[in-house]
C-alpha cells in the first residue's frame, strides 16, 4: 500500500483501548483486539497516524496502570492542532442534526476533530455511534454541508480487509 501520499488516520480512544487491552474471555473483544494489534504492527508505518486532545484526555482516565499503558502506546503519535472552536461547532451540528444522540458529545468531538483536520480515515471500535452504517449518511451530509470532508469511519478490521482486497487486485 506504499504510495507517494500517505493516508492520514485518526485514532479514536477505543482503538487505543483495544490495542493495550488485557486478556479477555469475550471472544469478540479478543478478536477485535487482535485486529487492532495487527493493524498497529502492519499498517501504521504505511499511514500518518494522529490523535486529538480528546483521545489523549480519555486515555488518561480510569485505572492508573491501564491509563499508563494507553498513554505509553500513543506517546509518539502526533497530536492534531487545537482547532476547538471549529471542532465544537461541527460536533454540535452533528448532535443537533441527529447524526449522534444528545449524550454522545465526545463521540461527536472525535468525528469533528478528524473532519476539521482533514483526516482520511477515523479508526474506532465504536460501532454504535461512529462506525455505524445507519448513521454514517447523516454524518457525511452534515460534515459536507459544513464545508469539510468526512473521513472514512471504520474499524481496524474493515481497514485491514479493504487493504487486503486492494493488494489482491493489483
Predicted regions and their residues:
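Short, well-structured N-terminal submotif of metal-dependent ribonuclease cores
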Residues: 1-51, 60-71, 96-102, 136-139, ...
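A residue-level structural signature of the nucleotidyltransferase/glycosyltransferase Rossmann-like core
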Residues: 8, 48, 122, 151-152
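Short, contiguous, well-structured surface segments enriched in hydrophobic/aromatic residues
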Residues: 55, 61-64, 78-80, 88
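Extended, non-globular alpha-helical segments
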Residues: 69-73, 77, 82-83, 155
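Active-site neighborhoods of divalent-metal-dependent phosphate/nucleic-acid chemistry enzymes
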Residues: 78-137, 160, 167
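C-terminal end-helix/capping segment
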Residues: 131-152
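C-terminal interaction segment
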Residues: 146-170
Amino acid at each position: 500500500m506504499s504510495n507517494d501520499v500517505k493516508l492520514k488516520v485518526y485514532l479514536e480512544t477505543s482503538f487505543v483501548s483495544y490495542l493495550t487491552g488485557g486478556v479477555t474471555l469475550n471472544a469478540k473483544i479478543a478478536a477485535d483486539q487482535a485486529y487492532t494489534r495487527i493493524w498497529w504492527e502492519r499498517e501504521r508505518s504505511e499511514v500518518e497516524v494522529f490523535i486529538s486532545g480528546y483521545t489523549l484526555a480519555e486515555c488518561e482516565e480510569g485505572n492508573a496502570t491501564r491509563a499508563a499503558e494507553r498513554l505509553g502506546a500513543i506517546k509518539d503519535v502526533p497530536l492534531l492542532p487545537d482547532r476547538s472552536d471549529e471542532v465544537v461547532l461541527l460536533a454540535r451540528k452533528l448532535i443537533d442534526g441527529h447524526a449522534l444522540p444528545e449524550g454522545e458529545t465526545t463521540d461527536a468531538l472525535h468525528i469533528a476533530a478528524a473532519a476539521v483536520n482533514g483526516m482520511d480515515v477515523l479508526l474506532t471500535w465504536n460501532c454504535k455511534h461512529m462506525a455505524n452504517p445507519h448513521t454514517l449518511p447523516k454524518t457525511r451530509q452534515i460534515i459536507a454541508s459544513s464545508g469539510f470532508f468526512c473521513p472514512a469511519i471504520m474499524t481496524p478490521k474493515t481497514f485491514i480487509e479493504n487493504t487486503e482486497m486492494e493488494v489482491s487486485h493489483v
